[in-house]
Amino acid sequence: MCGVRVVARVAAALLVIVAAAPATADARFKRCRSDATIRCGTVTVPLDRTGRVPGSVRLYAEQVPAEDQPPGGGAGRLVGRRAAPRGAIFALAGGPGQPATQFTSDFLFAFGDQAAGRDIVTFDQRGTGRSDLLRCPEVEKVALLSRYPESGQKCAERLGDRRGLYTTSDSVDDMEAVRRAIGVDRIAIYGASYGTKVALEYARRYPDHVERLILDSVVTPDGPDPLYRDTFNASPRVERASCGPECGFTSDAGEDLVAFARQLGDAPARGFVVDRRGRRLAQSLGSTRLLFLLLAGDFAPRIRAALPAAIYSARRGDPAQLLRVASLSEQSAEPADPRDFSTAVFAATICEEAPQPWRRDAAFDDRARQTDETLARYGDDAFTPLGPAAAAQSDLVQLCRRWTEASPGPPSVRPPLPDVPALILEGELDLRTPLEGAQRVAAQLPRSTLVTVPATGHSTLGSDGSACTLRAISRFLARESVLSKCANPSKILPPEHPAPLSLTEVAPFKGAPRSIARVLQAVDLTLNDLEDQAASQAVLSFDAGDNRSVAGGGLRGGRFRVGTSGMSIDRAVYAPGVRVSGRLLNRAGRIGIFRVAGSPAVSGVVEYRGGGVITGRLGGRRFRVRLRRVDTTPPDIELGRLARPVGAVPGVR
């Protein structure tokens, strides 16, 4: 759906508040964009509400008055229900660290008719976007925060006393200030990822102003867990679900992950990745890198589809596919533009309030020992299948390892959550905020409905390829019953298959002469693989603003480059012993001539003539066959993008 694709830009880090009381515009809100429907203004709040640290924060906000909103679109169109009372829709960004005003138009489009009669208001949380942007060059310059723990220490030193003033509690107080400035009373809150933590805390603190809660990819009230215990324990289940019924190469993808992780406990997987110049670069993969790769699949169906086969192959000693998909996912892990994501706010919020495996007053040199003691106290089963060593090296632990806390931290005992109607939306394949955590939160909310969205990862509003999430939200806001199961769920992207270890493992090409059937199939598999890699590289180049041509390496050797006329291929190897070179033309269907090299029995020429016709000579024998290819990609699949494994934490990039 078009609306789902637009919402995907939000990347699961947003908090929306739907108010049921009449809204009054603040006099400071003026038209401020080329889009005349959007108005902007500011709400000034204290930097430190205790007065200990002087200063203030100007919260930048945008407002789309109900009377200026175009009709039609969004979730409301899906369910023809009565119009809701006039009110306001507020949007808070999560992350923590992402500004919300860049998504004002996206929310207007996504909620469509459901916003009829309500103003839409977004604002940048303190320290993000245009709300007095918080900067820490030390953490802005690195993509994988876990590799540079000293960056967290330098950021804390730069921020000084301010570092303790960007907590969830501060965000809740800011949210209340904006609610008062806009002039609404009771509000329904939609939150995604970290936004659910803000939503739950706001509901706990200001229950009289909360009409209902919508929690999408919920972070537990005491989370996020720097040790990723829920993520670890849920990963075998998610691998099984990602594989679906089409993984004929394995009987249990979850057990493959468990067994492979056990192997990594003895030694990392070692192999090579072929770069865009055709060079073979040595790489290794341990349990921590595997953790970030699993998390990268939350926003990237292609990664999820690749992982079961890649893990299966790595388990039997061939890590080529796994190392390549890990390398591709990390290529997108570029440092974020601070205007789009404040890594300083992220560090300040997480390091001040996440429950670290050491005492808050622990000396830096003693934190490693206390971490080991905490891991031992939890026991190995708490970290199945990746193991406690991966937990100790997580991004959230390493980022905060040398951070001196400036705030007292969250209370150890919190009041119960309020008794308000709640809709909890959870992706079946979500590893950042797994289903198991959502179930615990649902048990604390007496009037909650938990909807598990199949074939969907983190942030159901942004990644659900069906209408399930939008329908559930629409019905819930209309005070109608919501089914706990999706009527027409998305289908998973068909899983990839393990790459052959030898030509004898390649299935014969149907209809081809027996003597060349495996070779011809190997050529076809090579072209399939290169086309898939070109598509992934194109996404990476677009996201990075890279104007270079799309290029990459073959799985086991060679390289490819995509130009205006098509793809040039130089000695690409997918099946061992079969090298493919030539040009795949940029035309409808597969058309091109390819030289095949290897032993005399496999060498020759293969020509794809279009219309599924393949001719040529292999091993001295002429042939002519017709390709019978079936595209098994469901038409409603949202392919998404390669997710950034940086800060693999709820709601972050």
Regions found by a protein language model. Give the residues of each.
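Gly/Pro-rich cap/lid or specificity-loop segments adjacent to the active site
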Residues: 26-289, 354-653
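Secretory targeting and sorting signals
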Residues: 2-25, 43, 175
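Alpha/beta-hydrolase-fold enzymes
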Residues: 243-350, 354-355
